[in-house]
Amino acid sequence: MIRGGGSPSPYPSVPNPSAGLKRQCAVGAPRKSVMSQTGRDDPQSLDSQLCFAVYAAAHAFGRAYRSLLAHHELTYPQYLVLLVLWEEEGLSVKEIGSRLFLDSGTLTPLLKRLEASGHVRRARDRPDERQVSIFLTDKGRGLKGKMDCLPHTVGGMTGMTLDERRALLDNLASMRDELHARAGSTELPAANASR
């Protein structure tokens, strides 16, 4: 179900996602499709893929932020780390990774670059010396005020109103949570594994 007053999903809610996918993807099974409502009748076309639309939009956001962040010599992933730390300092690498959906192999180099540029510092936790906590430096804290306009600026580039952006954010968060909850238990039939 789409939040924010949108239309209900044309796909049935199925307690066992695997059974639902097999039933929906069965040869000759009629199914109501979002694609046919928008003129995209081929469910295997790239333009009909919700996953690709989200992927492409994420890349477009990255490009939009890249030019704005270049003035501060930051990358978009580094900016995301700073957003987390502006909310709460002293988090472990694992806690930051959990919030950003990044593994330590991806996050550790980002933190090293932020540390080398003077935006963050690492500190060993006194009770457990193996645990490293990440804190902002004065330079890192000072960037927050300089970047307050970024979300509004990039949001304005979308061509959507603030209310539309908030509704989309709610829908995407709901979709993300559902996918995380179901991803491990879904078994796709080999012939229809495109989504």
Swiss-Prot record:
Residues 93-116 bind DNA. One of its GO terms (cellular component) is cytoplasm. InterPro entries: HTH_MarR-typ, MarR/SlyA-like, Transc_reg_Sar_Rot_HTH, WH-like_DNA-bd_sf, WH_DNA-bd_sf. PROSITE patterns: HTH_MARR_2. Formaldehyde-responsive transcription factor that modulates resistance to stress induced by formaldehyde. Impacts the expression of a number of genes encoding transcription factors and/or involved in stress response, including efgA, and which probably collectively trigger a formaldehyde-specific physiological response. Required for optimal transition to methylotrophy. Not involved in a general stress response. Keywords: Cytoplasm, DNA-binding, Stress response, Transcription, Transcription regulation. The keyword Glycoprotein does not apply. The keyword Transcription regulation applies. It is found in: Cytoplasm. This is HTH-type transcriptional regulator TtmR. One of its GO terms (molecular function) is DNA binding.
